[in-house]
Amino acid sequence: MKKVMIYGMGISGTGAKALLETEGYEVILVDDKKAMTSEEAMQHLDNIEFFIKSPGIPYNNFVKEVQKRGIKVLDEIEVAYNYMVEKNLKTKIIAITGTNGKSTTTAKISDLLNHAGYKACYAGNIGRSLSEVLLHEKDLDFVSLELSSFQLENVENFRAYISMIINMGPDHIERYNSFDEYYDTKFNIAKNQDENQYFIENIDDVEIEKRAKQIKAKRISVSKSKEANVYVEDNKIYVGKDFIIEADKLSLKGIHNLENTLFMVATAEILNIDREKLKEFLMVATPLEHRTELFFNYGKVKFINDSKATNVDSTKFAIQANKDSILICGGYDKGVDLAPLAEMIKENIKEVYLIGVIADKIETELKKVGYEASKIHKLETVENSLLDMKKRFTKDSDEVILLSPATSSYDQFNSFEHRGKVFKELVLKIFG
């Protein structure tokens, strides 16, 4: 029997296991918390056909030993894609990556396709693994597939019908040797495409433009500020010279969602989706949870949950959409430059509540740019911050409270979803 080893029992690992077992593989599961440990697994590396590493696991000593022995290291998406090719599945992949906006774009492209009459679902770094979808969802026309840089590190054959990189900004320096390495990894999403496929290109993004010439797919350009295949002019979205919709009529609000919408429109054009159907959808599409989500009003006080903002660029978009708000910010220290965040807060934020292990560093940067010390509240946790606000604000206070942390959650929470859920529960408990 053919043998494979899977390292990590998360969503992608368990999905790959189920898929490979239907193909007659003996699967050896390794997980330092839930199964055979990596130390024990060293004894089982003989006769392994290939090794699947879950995306969140770094290239530790065990993975390096696997590579040293010449065993092929793959990601779950590569295994699932190879299965699609072997089974001659007609499902087409629309692959989405980017530093920010990829989850919203992934989910909304899937929703748009279903609205237009196709059978589609989303998978990947959002919800289910591609392997699980292929096992349980038959006769799909499309899978809208969110891919993180971690999932794109070992691309060999993977190829999407349409691929896109929403934007690229500094992130994950704890994983990569440089930001250039991170950006180059993102571009693996398109490395196997040819002129029979499409790449949607954000021509506003400097890092994307630096690398776009290497793309062999048909390039469809989008821009918020200059003429492109799909672009914004005078607050209206156009395809070529054809007017599609006024930006004010979009149900997804904010400059970041305008960018996401351009990718949806470009996808619709590639697939010849009826423009009235497209417009209809864009006027009713709903935002995802934890993404600039206005979820509660305490009289005039509005509460917005943007827990998905795990990097500075993402928080920048939230601040631009909610100027003069009171910001709750901070969390795990990812080692990124906080000076741009401090400038953004100084120019646009009324007061800031700092939480998490990175609070001192953000405070230092804020003081460097001359942000008033009286506007900085360093209270360690979300709960302490909200309790302080409860003492200060009444239902007549005209305030917007924005949780947009600008970093990861792992110092106090399991995930950004957990952080957002706790924030919402605490707001309802304290103000509800």
Give, region by region, the residue ranges found by the protein language model.
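Short acidic low-complexity segments
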Residues: 33-47, 381
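Nucleotide phosphate-binding/pyrophosphate-handling subdomain across enzymes
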Residues: 3, 15-19, 23, 119, ...
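Short internal beta-strands
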Residues: 29-31, 199-203, 328-329, 348-357
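C-terminal helical cap/extension that packs against the catalytic core
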Residues: 341-399
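Phosphate-binding loop of NTP-binding sites
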Residues: 2-3, 14, 18-23, 40-46, ...
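NAD(P)-binding Rossmann-fold cofactor-contacting core
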Residues: 23-37
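Beta-strand->loop->alpha-helix junctions that form or flank phosphate-binding loops
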Residues: 74-79, 216-233, 279-283, 293-296, ...
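Glycine-rich Rossmann-fold phosphate-binding loop(s) that bind the pyrophosphate
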Residues: 9
